């Protein structure tokens, strides 16, 4: 969650301006999940780390939204990118995915844009770190690009650079001889001599 500084799936942040509280919503990992993921921070530990007012289980999110809707309060959300988030917004607010782009809050969009134009020292450190990793990703791709190597091999090595530095790719790596196709995914085709190859990658 960008505003909460937490990197874990299955969390929702609700900033309730009217009631002056910040909710961290999600479920604690149970014993069956620990077998798969190992020990992780509890919801309370994450709440303390990010400074949220309180935590609630995920089942409470619908109630939080319903209470706000019943009082005719405006619920602000950004235009969703992922399909699972579009479905979640539809379930919570009744806004169909086709209508979500225009229903998104322009007030919140402008606030986010304004806030993101100013960086704290920690954010600048992360940006500089990502730039160094991105440089290594691109120079690795340049070094490996030669006839007979597959697009998938090079893109796999490029992704591995990000992971080896404890980062993740900022988007699926684009590495293709078909640069005319936007967001072209790497294939098992071998690189051919004299062909132009497009690489777009980042951490």
Residue spans for each PLM region:
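Short catalytic-site patches enriched in acidic/histidine residues
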Residues: 1, 106-111, 149-203
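A composition/biophysics-driven feature that prefers long, compositionally simple stretches
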Residues: 1-136
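Short, charged/polar low-complexity linear motifs in solvent-exposed/disordered segments
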Residues: 40-43, 144, 201-202
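A broad detector of the eukaryotic-type serine/threonine protein kinase catalytic domain
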Residues: 113, 139-143, 180
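Active-site pocket-lining segments that scaffold enzyme catalytic pockets across diverse folds
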Residues: 119-143, 149-165
